Amino acid sequence: MTKRAAYLIVGLPHGGGTFLPAALHAHGPSLEEAGLRQPARSADEMFRASVEIRRDHQSWGLRRRDVEGAWSGVCRRADRSKGDIVVGHELLAAAGDPEIALLVDRLPGFDVHVVVAAGPADPRLTLFPDDYDLGAVLDRWAAHVRSPDRVHLLVTDPGDLTATWAALGRVVGFDAGLLPLPADLEVTADQDLGALRLLASSAGLLATVEELRRAAEEWAKTIAEGGYDVQGDLGGLAPSSPHGDDDEPVQARLDLVSGALAETVAELARLRREHAQLQVRAAKLQKKRRRLKRRLADATGD
């Protein structure tokens, strides 16, 4: 009997595919009619599931009980659903082997596919290799999905979200032309001086243009040898430099740092919103718990 497919969108952070889960959610009813389910009820739930899988709740200022059982809940709904499923969060890009094994093992009724969106090599590569080293991310996940044709790379163009959306449609099985992107997907953020100072102080540790070029070349070789499914041109992984062949001009470095700062501020704003949503949810649950406790006390006469 042929198993259903489970498509896991795992990043990369700032890889040009951050908008994909929101776009999928916006078209949830239409995708269900086409046989593609989304067992995560919300972005908040998938965020908590990802934090749980990564065992990283303390880093987010969360308690274990805030995230415990989130991934199990997603998997239970996946099991009860009909058709293929798609879920994901960019925090999963940096998952280690034990964490990936745990995630995949909870989906025994599915052929698990991993979808990775990546654009030009990111200068934060040397700061956060687990998140931004595309070759390592692909190899880690490929080891657990058992077949290279279940590893899908979407080479993204930061200026063309529609092309990335269409590439995802080809992979998971929907016609992106019939499901246009909502107009309000782009993330905006106010300036956060603390975040700017933090990353600016690390600017000397950011990868150079030449390091990024070498990384992109190595990734292209790894991808070709791995036999992965590629949507797009691998040349799109190379860093863009507005100064042609100059050997790492000062302006190019400044452009890389500026872009990294802007994207990190946007990401910080998004994560703060997710954290705030978690706090509101936790407060509501605590209020409900106190109310039920009072009712129980009244009923028992305690």
Predicted regions: what is each one?
Residues 1-302:
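Anion-recognition interface
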